[in-house]
Every structure is written in C-alpha cells, then in structure tokens.
Design a protein with these regions (language model features):
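Phosphopantetheine-dependent thiolation modules in NRPS/PKS and related acyl-activating systems
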Residues: 2-48, 52-55, 62, 66-95
Length: 95
C-alpha cells in the first residue's frame, strides 16, 4: 500500500505523499492507515521506537525512489522528523 503513480513516474502531490507514508506506517504498525493523522508524533502518538523509525525511513526511501532515483533520508535529517507532517514535508520538498 503506497502512493499511487499518477502516470509514468509522475511525482505524487502532497496528498499522494501523505497516503504513501500512511501506508508505510500502517504496514509497520499493523494498523488502519486511516487512523494515522498528519499531526501524529512518531514517538508519542504512534509509539515508534528507534528500530521502527529506521524501518520507516527505509520504507519511505523505497516508496519514493521510483519518482526520484536515489531518494534518501539523510541520517542527520531523520532526527528532525518528529511527526507525519514533518515526513510528508520532507519528501515533498525533495521529489
């Protein structure tokens, strides 16, 4: 479950990025993606530990690499991604 391509490698809009990240989180947490909100904190609301945060970063990289070859979340940037919104904003600005 992830961002739906809107054509051959066309980049998703903000809503598509949100949907993709919600899907990745839902897979990791085994919950309904609709229960994940943009304002949710990864640690306080979704209770992700450090291992799950790394899993999420890798899943996001895999999800969005098809739009921007070599898409990566830098280790130093990962520390600044505290909420779903932070992750969406990060991805949108780098696609």
């Amino acid at each position: 479950m992830g961002a739906e391509p809107q054509g051959e490698n066309s980049r998703p809009d903000r809503a598509g990025v949100l949907k993709g990240i919600q899907g990745q989180l839902a897979d990791i947490l085994e919950i309904d993606p609709e229960s994940i909100n943009e304002g949710d904190s990864f640690t306080e609301d979704l209770h992700l530990g450090s291992i799950e945060l790394i899993e999420l970063a890798e899943a996001i990289e895999d999800e969005f690499d098809r739009y921007t070859a070599g898409f990566r979340i830098e280790d130093e940037d990962l520390e600044d991604l505290k909420t779903v919104r932070d992750a969406v904003d990060y991805v949108v600005t780098r696609l």
